[in-house]
């Protein structure tokens, strides 16, 4: 994914984590974000609050975040 552009999200709450995705809560609402669309997904865990997360520009557009 080195060619991807990233969208930076602040104040992210990780509601749920699976092997494939994170359920996050941000100001715009709740969204399932695939782990492969998150920069450094191993840095996040279920229950994290106030996190800064970078997601691919593509998934942000797909989810209506960007």
Ranges and model annotations:
Residues 1-66:
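Catalytic phosphate/metal-binding cores of nucleic-acid and nucleotide-processing enzymes, i.e., regions
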């Amino acid at each position: 994914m080195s060619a991807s552009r990233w969208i930076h999200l602040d104040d992210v709450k990780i509601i749920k984590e699976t092997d494939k995705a994170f359920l996050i809560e941000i100001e715009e609402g709740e969204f399932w974000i695939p782990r492969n669309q998150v920069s450094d997904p191993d840095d996040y865990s279920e229950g994290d609050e106030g996190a800064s997360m970078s997601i691919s520009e593509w998934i942000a557009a797909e989810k209506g975040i960007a």
